[in-house]
Design a protein with these regions (language model features):
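Helix-to-loop junction immediately C-terminal to a conserved catalytic motif
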Residues: 48
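A short, proline-enriched helix->beta-strand linker immediately N-terminal to the Walker B motif
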Residues: 153-157
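Catalytic Walker B motif of ABC-type/P-loop ATPase nucleotide-binding domains
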Residues: 159-162
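Helix N-cap at the start of a conserved alpha-helix in ABC-type nucleotide-binding domains
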Residues: 170-172
């Protein structure tokens, strides 16, 4: 379970998240719905540790993020997959390298095992035959699919999605859902 208690985050004195209290059950699909600019992405970035709240607490099970050691944060990060609004791919890396990237940091898999898993994930999102291409050689929709493949590469316990269907055709959106 992910528990958010009295979360506050502001920028330049302007509150974006104010007194947020919510619980997300493990194994359930939860959605954060709100108007553009309402703080959905800021909440997501706090949940995954890319931002630190000004006050309040986020807990994964009985572990409070604010009290986690670097080692515990790394272990938590292994359990998280992230699909960003954009593809968030590395321009200097090929498609397969982009998908393999988190595996290099968070697994002890051999290069062959990482490549095999990356290929499997690319096939799951219907990106076939593009593994040696660079992101700028792909359409926006294909880049998004590669980002999704990277997000599922570690078979995460928690999958956070920031507008996961943006940039995808209707068929692929249904497939991803």
């Amino acid at each position: 379970m992910i528990k958010v208690e009295n979360l506050y985050k502001g920028f330049d004195g302007v509150p974006v998240l104010k007194n947020i209290n919510v619980e997300y059950e493990t194994g359930k699909c939860n959605m954060i719905i709100g108007a553009s600019g309402s703080g959905k992405t800021v909440l997501l970035k706090n949940l995954i540790g890319l931002m630190t709240p000004d006050s309040g607490e986020i807990s994964y099970g009985d572990m409070k993020m604010s009290q986690m050691t670097d080692k515990e944060k790394k272990l938590l990060r292994q359990k998280i997959g992230i699909i960003f609004k954009g593809s968030a791919l590395f321009d200097f890396a090929t498609v397969i390298e982009n998908v393999m990237f988190p595996m290099e940091f968070f697994t002890d898999w051999s290069p062959a095992q990482r490549r095999e898993r990356a290929q499997f994930c690319l096939e799951k999102v219907n990106v076939i035959g593009s593994d040696k291409k660079f992101p700028n050689e792909l359409s926006g929709g294909m880049q998004k699919r590669v980002g999704i493949a990277r997000a599922i590469a570690l078979n995460p316990e928690y999958l956070f999605c920031d507008e996961p269907n943006s940039g995808l055709d209707p068929y692929t959106s249904i497939l991803i859902d």
